[in-house]
Amino acid sequence: MALWWVPSIFALLVVLRIVFSELREFVRNIHFQRFAKAYGAEEPPRSLPGKLPRGIDRVYRLLNTRNSGEDVLDDLIMPRFKELGRNTFVSTGLLGERVVNTMDPRNIQAVLAVNFKDWEIGTRRHRQFGTVLGTAIFTSDGAEWSHFRGLARPQFTRENINDLEGTEKACRDLIRVIEVDASQNWTQPVNLRPLLYRFTLDAATTFFFGKSVNSQLIAAGMHEAGLSANDSRALSEDFDKAWTECSEWMAARIRLQGLYWLSNGPKYNKAVERVRDFANHYVQLALKSHSQSKTEIDLQTRRFSLLEGLAQDTSNPIELRDQILSLLMAGRETTANLLSWTFLLLAQNRATQAKLRAAIQDTFGDGPESITFASLKSCAILQHVLLETLRLYPVVPLNNRVAACDTVLPVGGGPDGSKPVAVRKGQICNFMVYGMHRREDIWGEDAAEFRPERWAGRKLDWNYIPFSGGPRVCLGQQYALTEAAYLLVRILQTFPDMEWVGTRGKARKGYGITMAPAGGVWVRFSRRTP
């Protein structure tokens, strides 16, 4: 007997599903309109439509910046705020989604702090980053995120940050590499950027794992014969290259928005494998250490490293690996790029450099003996230089959150932008830290200029968030600022002058997970005469 009725039933089910979905969306829209009306919310302006539907042409420009020479921030994003004359607007994403974009501190405060529970990282971020970082503090929400943050927080006490022995060794290694190329009264031109990445890698691995990878000396061929084969294999310059490739791929996945999965391939997979090998090396060391008695470990080391602490909580090697890679991303890349921009600005602004060097001499003398967390904080011009660098070049210039429920932003809607903006559950809000840090109505007409003096007597508020804010504020911000300040002091103590020898003009920005000087940091140093 022929089952002639089966296709008809199937077609009916399909129609019913479509009708149900449309009806559900209709009811959902009515509820959202009532929600928006209850809060007095109005629509913000929409960005001008692109030449192609769904913003395809804009996404193409984002992905083609290397070939076109356009700057993602200055040429593609900031002009949209300027065209509309507003600090909050709505744009259309690649898959047709309605995206809110803002550089208003009141809205950013609402997202990150006031209405924190209304917002989340979201599943897309996890899928964009998860191939490399797995499930960890930067890719999780809710109780899972709270768990990971709780594990990491104890490492970032003032006592631990003030333990600067590993930082001093990393400084000496960097200075040693610079001085090798010395010629007459000046060193040869050197690109500081890769050296700074190795400095932060060496310092971070000491801080997190209790042992430096010695990447600076290994890369320069200056490491001692006593370094083990495992050190040379697992901690070599190859990791730097692999991590850079992973960072670039993750950045491309962000630009592709909902089509992030298109950014993949054998080269990316190989880089991920290399980065994971690096992390797995340390996981195995930590698990081996954990197999010893706690008493024996206490006799061998003054305190547990963070990884050893994590190993007390879980013996799952995948979870440990994910936490390591997240910490390395924050501890290495963020600090290295802060230092890269700082040295670039100081080399190009010799008067500020001279003032800073004089203050360092007065405060710290010629050696590391008096450098502590407290003394670094007490040197005003040193802190002002770092604050100003992060204002102009926040290492994470653009970030976002996803609405976990229907919610509102306090301003940006209506004809004059004074009304609230209603945001639907699942909607993305991009917040532009770079743009907010350069708003002339906040910072003055010289907002684009490097002027550390502007920080004298100025208090930090929501106009300035280089380390984010609210409950998810960067745990390692004091660690990063201390590492950066320490190296600045030691370099300016060692070398009487630093001169810019790179390309003049507007600095080109490179975008991975963080923002870095695309052309490197090309300088030379004068040598101290006997």
Q: What is the predicted role of each segment?
A:
Residues 334-347, 487:
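Short, small-residue alpha-helix embedded
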Residues 2-147, 161-162, 166-180, 271-274, ...:
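N-terminal membrane-proximal hinge/A-helix region immediately C-terminal to the signal-anchor transmembrane segment
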Residues 225-229, 234-241, 296-301, 344-396, ...:
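Cytochrome P450 I-helix active-site segment
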Residues 213-214, 350-352, 460, 473, ...:
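Cytochrome P450 heme-binding "Cys pocket" and the immediately downstream C-terminal segment
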Residues 64-82, 369-417:
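Conserved cytochrome P450 K-helix E-x-x-R motif and the immediately C-terminal K′/meander segment
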Residues 121-127, 163-337:
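Cytochrome P450 heme-thiolate monooxygenase catalytic core
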Residues 395-398, 417, 425, 430-458:
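Conserved cytochrome P450 K-helix/beta-meander segment immediately N-terminal to the heme-binding cysteine loop
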